[in-house]
Every structure is written in C-alpha cells, then in structure tokens.
Amino acid sequence: MVLSPADKTNVKSTWDKLGGHAGEYGGEALERTFASFPTTKTYFPHFDLSPGSAQVKAHGKKVADALTLAVGHLDDLPGALSALSDLHAHKLRVDPVNFKLLSHCLLVTLACHHPAEFTPAVHASLDKFFSAVSTVLTSKYR
C-alpha cells in the first residue's frame, strides 16, 4: 500500500505528538490485543500476561520502537524492517493475521488517548501505515 504525501504527513505528525508515550501506548495496545484476541497469547507462553505486566509493557515498547523506526523510513519500509520481517517469518513464525489484530488495537489505543487529533483523515492514514508495516513484516513468509 502506497502512502500519499498527506498520509506521510499525518503519520509523522501523529507520531510526533505521542512524544514519550509511544512505549506506553504500545504496551496498552498489546494488552488490548491479548484481551480481545486470546489466541494471540500463544506466542508468549513465557510471559506474565496479566494486566500491567512488566513483560507486556517491555514488549509493547519494542513494538513502538519498531513503529518509530518505520515512521522515520516511510519511503523504505522494507529496508527499515527487513530484520524484523526475517525474525517474525523464520524464527517466531507469527501468523500474519496477528499483525492486523495488533494494528486494530493500536488504532483504538491512539484514538482513546488522542480523540481530538484522531480525525477520519488521520485514522485512514494510520490504518494505511499499519497495513503497510504488516505487509512488510509478512513479506518474507512467501
């Protein structure tokens, strides 16, 4: 999915507004994913998956850091996320549908924390961005 110049602007400006909260939101979105889609827990048998878990928060920060990297490389997502794509496809073998589930929970989390900024245009741009990231992360499954 190709991000338009307006999409790129929306994604960058939204991500800039998250400030130091990106890791917190990543953890919250991951908690939301586990609560809403319990089958996603199967990839984390060694984690304490209870609400507020330090392990979930730490992994949520990793998710947010990867997305921050992607935001900084909107014109080369495959290059920026190549190592993560390899990891998820070949070592972790995460079912690709889980990226869509997490993307949805990220959108919900961002909308909850930034309702005024979460306009239809921003929502659409973030959805396209998360979809593009998901596509890159699943590209090496083929």
Swiss-Prot record:
Which CDD domains does this one have? Hb-alpha-like
Where do the annotations place heme b binding? H88
Q: Which Gene3D superfamilies match?
A: Globins
Sorted alphabetically, the Gene Ontology BP terms of this entry are: hydrogen peroxide catabolic process
Give the Phosphotyrosine positions (modified residues): Y25
* GO cellular component terms, semicolon-separated: blood microparticle; haptoglobin-hemoglobin complex; hemoglobin complex
Can you name one GO molecular function term for this protein? oxygen carrier activity
Binding sites annotated in the UniProt record for O2:
H59
Residue(s) carrying N6-acetyllysine: K17
| Modified residue annotations for N6-succinyllysine | K8, K12, K17, K41
Give the coiled coil ranges.
Answer: none
Q: Does the keyword GTP-binding apply?
A: no
Domain of life of the organism encoding this protein: Eukaryota
Residue numbers carrying Phosphoserine: S4, S36, S50, S103, S125, S139
| Modified-residue entries (Phosphothreonine), positions | T9, T109, T135, T138
Provide the free-text tissue specificity comment from this protein's UniProt record: Red blood cells.
The keyword Iron appears for this protein: yes
- Which stretches make up the Globin domain? 2-142
What are the entry keywords? Acetylation, Heme, Iron, Metal-binding, Oxygen transport, Phosphoprotein, Transport
What is the protein's quaternary organization?
Answer: Heterotetramer of two alpha chains and two beta chains.
PANTHER family, per database record: HEMOGLOBIN FAMILY MEMBER, HEMOGLOBIN SUBUNIT ALPHA
In the record, the note on similarity to other proteins reads: Belongs to the globin family.
Q: What does this protein do?
A: Involved in oxygen transport from the lung to the various peripheral tissues.
Could you identify this protein by its name?
Hemoglobin subunit alpha
Organism source for this protein? Ailurus fulgens
Lineage at the top is: Eukaryota, Metazoa, Chordata, Craniata, Vertebrata
